[in-house]
């Protein structure tokens, strides 16, 4: 069972609609999270809260204006997650120029922003102070080796986020 106050999020990359529906029926996640080439219609078809991930710096999303224009179509999303661009899908462990988010943040339809991409205990404070995201997402930045998380690195990461967030 999932503990109280924890949301279940189902992450998909270019899923078959039947697979998404099966997860909705069998798991009942609070949120769907789309990381592929899903259109706004693909994301909204389930009538369920969703997060949309964007790969900042991808072809066609390499300027602040282009990124904001693309994001605008996903105005129904519960939040927008920004990761760095890599040729494949999934986290690359690399950061991106956070200046690309300037137009996104200023857009009237902007959604809660989740920052991802190359975040570590050493750089997350500067990223939080610069971007002021609603949340941060980390994976490889707290690993001691691929797939192995360090409880110390996680603690340092969380402490850095709290310290940066307190400096409003």
Over which residues does each language-model region extend?
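C-terminal helical cap(s) of enzyme catalytic domains, especially alpha/beta-barrels
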Residues: 1, 43-45, 128, 139-168
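Conserved anion-binding
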Residues: 2-115, 119
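Conserved strand-to-helix beginnings and helix N-cap segments that scaffold or border functional pockets
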Residues: 21, 63-65, 125, 148-151
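Residue-level signal for alpha-helix termini/capping positions
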Residues: 25, 106, 129-132, 162
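Proline-aspartate-enriched helix->loop->beta-strand connector
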Residues: 29, 133-136
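Active-site-proximal flexible loops/turns
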Residues: 90, 104, 125, 144, ...
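Conserved active-site loop/cleft motifs that coordinate metal ions or position small ligands
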Residues: 114-116, 135-139
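Acidic, divalent-metal-coordinating active-site segment for phosphoryl/phosphodiester hydrolysis
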Residues: 120-124
């Amino acid at each position: 069972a999932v503990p109280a106050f924890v949301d279940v999020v189902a992450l998909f990359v270019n899923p078959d609609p039947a697979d998404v529906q099966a997860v909705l029926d069998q798991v009942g996640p609070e949120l769907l999270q789309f990381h592929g080439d899903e259109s706004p219609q693909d994301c909204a078809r389930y009538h369920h809260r969703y997060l949309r991930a964007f790969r900042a710096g991808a072809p066609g999303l390499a300027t602040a204006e282009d990124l904001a224009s693309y994001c605008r179509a996903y105005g129904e999303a519960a939040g927008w997650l920004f990761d760095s661009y890599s040729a494949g899908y999934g986290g690359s462990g690399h950061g991106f120029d956070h200046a690309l988010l300037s137009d996104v943040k200023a857009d009237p339809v902007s959604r809660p922003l989740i920052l991802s991409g190359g975040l570590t205990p050493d750089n997350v404070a500067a990223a939080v102070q610069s971007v002021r995201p609603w949340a941060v997402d980390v994976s490889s930045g707290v690993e001691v080796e691929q797939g192995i998380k360090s409880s110390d690195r996680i603690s340092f990461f969380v402490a850095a986020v709290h310290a940066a967030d307190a400096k409003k």
